[in-house]
Amino acid sequence: MRGVVVLVGILGCIYSISQFLRNSVGVIAPNLASELDLSASQIGFLASAFFFAFAGAQIPLGIALDRYGPRRCMLFCAAVAVAGALIFAAAPSPGWLIAARILMGLGSSCYLMAPLALYARQFSPDRFATLVGFQIGLGSLGTLLATAPFAFAVAVLGWRASFVIIAAAMVVATLAIVLIVPKDDGSEADRSAESLRDSFAGTRDAIRTPSFWPVFLLQLTGYSSFVLVVGLWGGPYLTHVYGYSLTERGNMLLVAVVAQVIGSFLWGPSDRLFNSYKIPVLAGSLLTAGLMALAAIVGAFSPTGLLLWFIALGGMTAYLTVLIAHGKSLFPPKLVGRGLTLFNMATMGGVFLTQAATGLIIDLFPQVDGGYSVDAYRTVFAVQAICILLGSLAYLRSRDPRKQL
């Protein structure tokens, strides 16, 4: 039991660094826009470059997980992520920042799927959703660090020095993987004998799995709703609409992340509680759509209403833990790595599309006193609500393996 706790702790720790990197633009977006004279669409593209690279890496990552094993993939990706963080810290121009975000996205691409592939092979299926909850819950600590603690570090050290510290933390976590995570077993060695053509055929088989597309389409909108706010537009929204300072917006984003951390642990076992994947997933997705619609209608909340909205957003979007478990349950063991990474491609691809598109949407509105009006953000929330509802409608067609147990 102690070994399991240490293993999950180490994997959750390095995943938290990945989470920090992906969400780090949210707090410093106004700083980057001011320092480098970036428009909303440029900020959106800068943030989304991470997710574009992350999503693009998922198919080859799925093949690599099944051929070479989780441990080797994590060690390789760590080197790429460290390089990206250091380049971001030293970047002299927007082009270098984007290149660094791409490297960070590639380097961070395996730190959810590799641990989940490891859990799928070493633990019983009925515990998988709970382990997903712990992995995402621990990883969410990185998102937490990307809010108020990061705002404090930026105020004291600057954002460049802060990224050097993150690179050093990634190096330490990588050493822990070397020492703690078990070496990949012989099953990967057997799979490595298959041809590249066979590997891609396995990806094709995963795509053809019944209920793949309904789950895939909801994955496009689930996580992107949370990252849209905490990882990108939450900071500018709080600054432009409410006049929040760096520290104040960091604190409010922190509230949402804490709510998601707690929510991840609570949502994790809900599939067993209801003996269903679909019931909790649909509840979470529809409540998230409702929150986005509420923000689109209200525009500017009262201070108490704003706080409650951020708490609810963090808690409701944590249903992703059950959606991941539902996706995993669709595949036979030999396709788990490829199947999970295909769903992760949808998750991160959805973030890329959402962040890039909303940057273009916000740029359609004229700036007001150096910022954007509440109507710009209301439009963003409305578009996201519609996307979630469409994803939920598609998800209704999925089969629920839990109902067959």
Predicted feature residues:
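Cytoplasmic membrane-interface "Motif A"-like loop-to-helix N-cap segments
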Residues: 67-78, 272-286
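Juxtamembrane intracellular "pre-TM" segments in multi-pass secondary transporters
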Residues: 184-216
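Helix-loop-helix hairpin linking two adjacent transmembrane segments in secondary transporters
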Residues: 125, 134-183
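Helix-breaking motifs and short loop linkers at transmembrane-helix boundaries and internal kinks
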Residues: 37, 69, 90-96, 124, ...
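Cytoplasmic helix-loop-helix junction between adjacent transmembrane helices
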Residues: 94, 100-139
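Conserved MFS/SLC helix-loop-helix module at the cytosolic interface between two early adjacent transmembrane helices
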Residues: 56-95
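Extracytoplasmic gate region of multi-pass secondary transporters
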Residues: 25-26, 210-267, 354-359
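Helix-to-loop junctions at the C-terminal end of transmembrane segments
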Residues: 57-69, 263-276, 362
